[in-house]
Amino acid sequence: MQVILLQRIVNLGKLGETVDVKSGYGRNYLIPQGKALPATPANVEKFEARRAELEAIEAEELAAANKRAEALTDVNVIMRAKSGEDGKLFGSIGTRDIADALTKSGLEVDRAEVKLPEGTLRQVGEYNVDIQLHHDIFASILVTILSEDGDVEAAQQEAEEDAE
């Protein structure tokens, strides 16, 4: 089945491309989600009429993602968690925890945008975490995990000194 993509889809294609997909994927996912149209001559004409509008929407999303990436530059998130003597956490810090901490600090981040390629964080320490704001735009933040009985103020002062 051939479809016209109405937005960029990872591992499939970009806006406006006509691609071959399995019939079930096209009928049951891409078309109902509004991500593609069947590649009929009538739909090709409709798409060409809307191409500029769709490209403008994509450009706006890209600009918004760039703006959010600038806001996330040099962000240091300090989190506290219970841990044992050796620094191993009781539990773990995951994408939801990091997204919630960023949201509390005034930066709107969805948990699906937080990327932890090595899995959840299970040790006290500093970690660089990527935030994927758009297909091609990533922001890197520093997440510092302290023991719950650790001194948060000292860690904040240390982070400020490192930034200077």
UniProtKB/Swiss-Prot annotation:
Gene3D superfamilies: Ribosomal protein L9, C-terminal domain (3.10.430.100), Ribosomal protein L9, N-terminal domain (3.40.5.10)
Annotated GO biological process: translation
Record flagged with keyword ATP-binding: no
Signal peptide: none
InterPro entries (UniProt xref): Ribosomal_bL9 (IPR000244), Ribosomal_bL9/RNase_H1_N (IPR009027), Ribosomal_bL9_bac/chp (IPR020594), Ribosomal_bL9_C (IPR020069), Ribosomal_bL9_C_sf (IPR036791), Ribosomal_bL9_N (IPR020070), Ribosomal_bL9_N_sf (IPR036935)
Any single GO CC term annotated in Swiss-Prot or TrEMBL for this entry: ribonucleoprotein complex
Molecular function via GO: rRNA binding; structural constituent of ribosome
Keywords: Ribonucleoprotein, Ribosomal protein, RNA-binding, rRNA-binding
Keyword Nucleotide-binding in annotation: no
Function summary: Binds to the 23S rRNA.
Family: Belongs to the bacterial ribosomal protein bL9 family.
Protein name: Large ribosomal subunit protein bL9
